[in-house]
């Protein structure tokens, strides 16, 4: 419902049709849980574009339907699953199967992230979109920016710092060494 509101869909529901399964040649890549999620998405999404007409040359309802499918596919790529239903469901099934309450927490987090100002990845995606590029190329630009160590990559670095500090016998010394210049 939030995407429909942000996309100004009116009565159209671009999520009405099920997203379908992965194309046969892409299924092994899209569901390879040994690949890091961002790498899996960056490798698969450009190839998915081969199966979709140029999204910016289509009418508005078609563009929204392409975007809805791509949104579901992107979520499925995050957890190496097949695209399905609302975006929060495959995430819940991968992270905490059967956790209905957890599903609502995931959905709420996604709602909070839906319109989150202009960060680096959103800016990169908007620049690419402004050229009339395929929607899949636009998403790839955002993901490429997200992969940088000063944007999405910072999360992995922060997690490693917290884990290292938790495992250290001298937390203050560990953090001081990590933050020392050079």
Language model region names:
Residues 1-182:
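Hydrophobic alpha-helical bundle cores within soluble ligand-binding/oligomerization subdomains
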């Amino acid at each position: 419902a939030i995407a429909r509101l942000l996309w100004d869909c009116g009565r159209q529901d671009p999520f009405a049709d099920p997203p379908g399964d992965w194309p046969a040649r892409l299924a092994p890549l899209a569901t390879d849980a040994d690949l890091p999620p961002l790498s899996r998405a960056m490798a698969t999404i450009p190839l998915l574009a081969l199966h979709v007409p140029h999204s910016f040359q289509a009418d508005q309802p078609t563009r929204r339907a392409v975007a809805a499918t791509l949104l579901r596919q992107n979520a499925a790529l995050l957890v190496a699953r097949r695209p399905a239903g609302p975006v929060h469901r495959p995430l819940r099934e991968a992270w905490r199967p059967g956790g209905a309450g957890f599903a609502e927490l995931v959905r709420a987090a996604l709602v909070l992230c839906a319109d989150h100002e202009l960060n680096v990845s959103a800016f990169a995606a908007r620049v690419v979109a402004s050229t009339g590029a395929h929607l899949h190329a636009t998403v790839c630009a955002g993901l490429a920016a997200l992969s940088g160590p000063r944007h999405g990559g910072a999360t992995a670095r922060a997690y490693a710092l917290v884990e290292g500090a938790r495992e250290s016998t001298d937390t203050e010394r560990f953090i001081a060494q990590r933050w020392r210049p050079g």
